[in-house]
C-alpha cells in the first residue's frame, strides 16, 4: 500500500477541504481519466482496491497512472482509552481530494474498456467521480 517513506511531521491537524483543485485537474499522461466530482478523503487501502480493480479489467494491455498519493496521517487512540493524554498515534494514511482532481489515468486501450474499468474502480471510492477523455488542445 502507498505511504510516505519519511515525513517532516508525524501528526497533522484535520483542516477542511475548501474549493476546487486547480493543479492535477487535467489528463496529462494517459488518454482517459477518472476525475473527482466531490471532495473527500481516500485511504491508501481504497486507492489500492481501485488500482487492483482496474488492473483486473485491463489485464496486460494498457498503462495506468495513479495521480494521487496519501500524504496525510490519520491518528487514532487505542480502544478503551480515557480522554486526554495527548493525540493518538498515526494509524493510516489518506489523500485529501478536492473536486476536479484526476485520480487515475489510462492509455493503450480502447475507450469502452477504459470506461468499464474506471467505472468499476469508482465503486471502490467514497467520492463521486466521472470519466474524462484527454482534451484535443
Curated annotation (Swiss-Prot):
The record's section on InterPro entries has: Ribosomal_uL16 (IPR047873), Ribosomal_uL16_bact-type (IPR000114), Ribosomal_uL16_CS (IPR020798), Ribosomal_uL16_dom (IPR016180), Ribosomal_uL16_sf (IPR036920)
Q: Which residues cross the membrane?
A: none
Ranges of Basic residues composition bias in the record: 1-17
Q: Which cellular component appears as one GO term in the record?
A: cytosolic large ribosomal subunit
Region annotated Disordered, chain positions: 1-24
GO BP, sorted A to Z: translation
Complex formation:
Part of the 50S ribosomal subunit.
- Say which family it is in: Belongs to the universal ribosomal protein uL16 family.
State the NCBIfam families in the record: rplP_bact
Its function, per the record, reads: Binds 23S rRNA and is also seen to make contacts with the A and possibly P site tRNAs.
Name of the molecule in the record: Large ribosomal subunit protein uL16
Species, as recorded: Leptospira interrogans serogroup Icterohaemorrhagiae serovar Lai (strain 56601)
Amino acid at each position: 500500500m502507498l505511504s510516505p517513506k519519511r515525513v517532516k511531521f508525524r501528526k497533522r491537524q484535520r483542516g477542511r477541504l475548501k474549493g476546487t483543485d486547480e493543479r492535477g485537474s487535467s489528463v496529462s499522461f494517459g488518454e482517459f481519466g477518472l476525475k473527482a466530482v466531490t471532495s473527500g478523503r481516500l485511504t491508501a487501502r481504497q486507492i489500492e482496491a481501485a488500482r487492483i480493480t482496474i488492473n483486473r479489467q485491463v489485464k496486460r494491455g494498457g498503462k495506468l497512472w495513479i495521480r494521487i498519493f496519501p500524504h496525510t496521517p490519520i491518528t487514532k487512540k487505542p480502544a478503551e482509552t480515557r480522554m486526554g493524554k495527548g493525540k493518538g498515534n498515526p494509524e493510516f494514511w489518506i489523500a485529501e481530494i478536492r473536486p476536479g482532481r484526476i485520480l487515475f489515468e489510462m492509455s493503450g486501450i480502447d475507450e469502452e474498456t477504459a470506461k468499464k474499468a474506471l467505472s468499476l474502480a469508482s465503486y471502490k471510492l467514497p467520492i463521486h467521480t466521472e470519466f474524462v477523455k484527454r482534451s484535443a488542445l
